[in-house]
Amino acid sequence: MDLTRQGWLHGQPTASGVLKSTPEDFVVIEDLGYSPDGDGEQLLVRVRKQGCNTRFVAEALAKFAGIPARDVSFAGMKDRHAVTEQWFCLRLPGKVTPDLNAFQLEGVEVLESARHRRKLRIGALQGNAFTLVLRQVSDRDAVEQRLQLITAVGVPNYFGSQRFGHDGNNLKLAQRWAADEIRVRERSKRSFILSAARSAMFNQVVSDRLAQQGSLCRVLAGDALQLTGRGSWFVAETAEMDSLQQRVDNNELRITAPLPGSGEWGTRDDALSFEQQSLAHEGALIALMERERVDAARRAMLVIPRELRWRWADDATLEMSFWLPAGSFATSVVRELIVTQSSSNEADE
């Protein structure tokens, strides 16, 4: 599977630029979508961090609170080479709330904390707000045109390269695991590897759909359609194709692609045939998902950034902000704008 083979919705960018020349050029703020309950056995802690990864902070919080590392959870991994505001959840049944003013960790600041009744689980976010700075942008006019297109039409909802590990190593491990060349016993490592494989297969289907149709909004018979912003889906019936196409055009519905696993794909007819053909050479990876009892799921192929705003600090420096639903990647927005030149700071999560 070629991770570099990902099509563009608006054509390959002609402009180039630099992302993450400094951590301050990439700011992420988690949006839980709710306020803490104010009571309960869980303690929600919001921190601002820079220069350290999510698991490192979670382990430090566990040590500070005197609890096992497994009793600290979070909704998602955040890049160490960025400024991020992130929530952690400490399970403290019958325990006194620790004085987090005394918590010290280089690059980390505790912003607030409150009791809550439910554990914070992976993916349990409404979304993330991003503020980015692109530097050394080579063609302001071309980028401006693409910003208008992205505002109106959106971008492919690809998983970003950080999902696959450095140089795609997580996917390579998945392929070796699927071929019975290695065994993976560590639970967290298994999760990363399986996630990388599913994400790569999703990206492949999206890219193939773009190559065939030039669009991610043209409904096929049997497509699995999702209410925009919702997780559940239903199958497009042939008799309803015209009305469903209109709802997709109006951004009420999104066409989905598979996150392969055990269970049905969720599509039928033409859509199912297309997905099976797209992943025809990935039988070993799909079998691995089934063997490891990873539930099949669906994910929207298109995402439209909300509240997309931008300003030019000068002709080569673009400041932009936008909001994406949980699981969508800011780097997938940027790749439709510019060809990113290498910087010294690359994502590791």
UniProtKB/Swiss-Prot annotation:
Give the active-site positions: D79 (nucleophile)
Q: Which GO terms describe its cellular component?
A: cytosol
The catalytic activity of this protein is classed by the Enzyme Commission as 5.4.99.27
Name the CDD domains for this protein.
Answer: PseudoU_synth_EcTruD (cd02575)
According to the lineage, what is the superkingdom?
Bacteria
Which key words are in the record? Answer: Isomerase, tRNA processing
The answer to keyword Isomerase applying to this record is yes
Question: Which Pfam families has this protein been placed in?
Answer: TruD (PF01142)
Q: Which reaction does it catalyse?
A: uridine(13) in tRNA = pseudouridine(13) in tRNA
Give the top-level enzyme category.
Answer: isomerase
Domain TRUD: start-end pairs: 154-303
Enumerate the residues binding substrate. F26, N128, F329
Task: Kindly list the GO molecular function terms attached to this UniProt entry.
Answer: RNA binding; tRNA pseudouridine(13) synthase activity
- Please provide the Gene Ontology terms (biological process) for this protein: tRNA pseudouridine synthesis
Described function: Responsible for synthesis of pseudouridine from uracil-13 in transfer RNAs.
State the similarity comment. Belongs to the pseudouridine synthase TruD family.
What is the name attached to this protein's record?
tRNA pseudouridine synthase D
Q: Which organism is it from?
A: Erwinia tasmaniensis (strain DSM 17950 / CFBP 7177 / CIP 109463 / NCPPB 4357 / Et1/99)
